[in-house]
Amino acid sequence: AKRPADGLHVIFITQNLGRLRGVVEALEGSGREISWCIYRRKEQNITERMKEETKADALVILDPGVLEEFGEQAEHGKYKGAELYGVGYSLKTVALLDKGNIQGLVVPDGYEIGYKSVKEIAGKIEHKFYKMQGYTTEYQIFSKKDFFMDDDLERFLYSYE
């Protein structure tokens, strides 16, 4: 894996190519690039796979279950020397953020995702030729340094009411 100009070695972990494409698009024009990516195959033991990889400064984990798994194994705010960042939406990931095992968390708006998904599916069921659409949804970003369980938990839970 090549090191970027700033010397930070960041590994992205995902099993969803759509999420990876989103990261690539977001980085376009920023002068940043992905130095290493691990595409997780179904049922693959990702922690075993990580033992084979080079040391990283940060892991960006785009799969909520994997983020929980790595977050549980993190010690002193790091997983094998790497800070953890990722996408998650469970109370467990919020607790891991509060504890300091995860440094940054992106939380998609689960209510909006569910509502719009059902609306599109209903449109397709009711009208055979209806063309289903994709949507951009809202999300919240929480950083460990700015996160306080008492204040921010309500904001997190609000998107799931």
Language-model features, listed with the residues they occupy:
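Short beta-strand elements at the ligand-binding edges of bilobed clamshell
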Residues: 1, 14, 99-111
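A conserved helix-loop-strand patch within extracytoplasmic ligand-binding domains
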Residues: 1-10
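Sec-exported extracytoplasmic/periplasmic mature domains
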Residues: 2-3, 28-32, 51, 71-75, ...
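Hinge/cleft segment of the Venus flytrap/periplasmic-binding protein
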Residues: 7, 112-161
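Extracytoplasmic ligand-binding site segments that recognize negatively charged/polar headgroups
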Residues: 9-26, 114
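Electropositive phosphate-/nucleotide-binding environments in soluble metabolic enzymes
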Residues: 17, 64, 108-111, 115
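Hydrophobic alpha-helical
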Residues: 17-23, 35, 39-96
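Residues at the C-termini of beta-strands that transition into short coil/loop
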Residues: 40, 88, 109, 139, ...
